[in-house]
Amino acid sequence: RINGECCGALDQHLSANETALTKVKRNIDNWLIEGIDTIISAASGCGVMVKDYPKLFDKNDPYYSKAEEISNKTKDIAEFLVNEDLSQLSTPKVKLNYHAPCTLQHGQQLPGIVESILIKLGYDLPDVPDAHMCCGSAGTYSTLQPKISKQLRNEKLKNLDDDQFELILTSNIGCLLHLQNGTKTPVKHWIEIFEWL
């Protein structure tokens, strides 16, 4: 576990850019002082924010190269596990589906990575119609635009066939909470299945 604070994503979503930048700089400084080799993020929204740190600075800014160094050391937890041999793990037999969040498939450009791990673990995943579409959480969007956000959520849950599964998994904390507010089917972070092994 590394020292740091909020990645700054929520502040940035709310256009509190200076507050976000203060947090970003503090994180960069702390992590470089600690001499970290890798940052593994289980929250895809935080992961994409940290990977995008260089975009917050002009190339002439002294923080630009520091932000690039941190960005290059940041991996989603799926990137860490995708090449691991998981064949010896005994997975719980549960009928599940997976929601691929925008932050993982579009932001981090890692479409299908979690699905490939779940398939390796022995789960049959259906094709989700319009899987590329947002569930409506979108950072602070669900709070600032609740009506449209709920419409997007309801469409996503319909496409996930939420009432046909025992469990819905995702990689994004905001998506998890947002989807859970619209269904009785438990919604969990996909990495939680490893607790049951």
Give the ranges of each region predicted by the language model:
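Iron-sulfur cluster-binding electron-transfer modules in prokaryotic oxidoreductases
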Residues: 1-197
